[in-house]
Amino acid sequence: MKVLNNLLYTGDHEWVRVEDNKAYIGISDCAQRMLSDIVFVELPEVDDEIAKGETFATIESVKAASDSYMPVSGTIVEINEELEDNPAALNEDPYGSWIVAIEMADKNELEELIKPEVYEKICEELDKEA
């Protein structure tokens, strides 16, 4: 299982990559492994305003459907349209296949996210339980 050191994470297994006031958001390797084969991703619309903690995407796999929750508040400025035709990209490259990009409303919310070294321990514990 892979955890990248240049990202921040949530307890719901989303990752955040910050570029100035823009944040790219996707699901972690840990999440895609739990979901298994991803077959569909329901994406939001560009210009949607989504508050921290609200659902921004639904990911369906052969095992289950899972909501993804916005780690920081903001406005959707980009969606990864590749996922409409190739949702399995989230399995193949979870850190290269972001879901949305947002213009953050409050960068201070980033302080509440999980650092990579802590998230790695969380995933290791989940692996032991599996």
Swiss-Prot record:
Gene3D superfamilies: 2.40.50.100. InterPro entries: 2-oxoA_DH_lipoyl-BS, Biotin_lipoyl, GCV_H, GCV_H/Fam206, GCV_H_sub, Single_hybrid_motif. Its cofactor is (R)-lipoate. The modification N6-lipoyllysine is found at residue 63. Binds 1 lipoyl cofactor covalently. One of its GO terms (cellular component) is glycine cleavage complex. PROSITE patterns: BIOTINYL_LIPOYL, LIPOYL. Keywords: Lipoyl. SUPFAM superfamilies: Single hybrid motif (SSF51230). GO terms for biological process: glycine decarboxylation via glycine cleavage system. Residues 22-103 form the Lipoyl-binding domain. It comes from the Bacteria. Pfam families: GCV_H (PF01597). NCBIfam families: gcvH (TIGR00527), PRK01202.1 (NF002270). The glycine cleavage system catalyzes the degradation of glycine. The H protein shuttles the methylamine group of glycine from the P protein to the T protein. HAMAP family: GcvH (MF_00272). Belongs to the GcvH family. The glycine cleavage system is composed of four proteins: P, T, L and H. This is Glycine cleavage system H protein. The gene is gcvH.
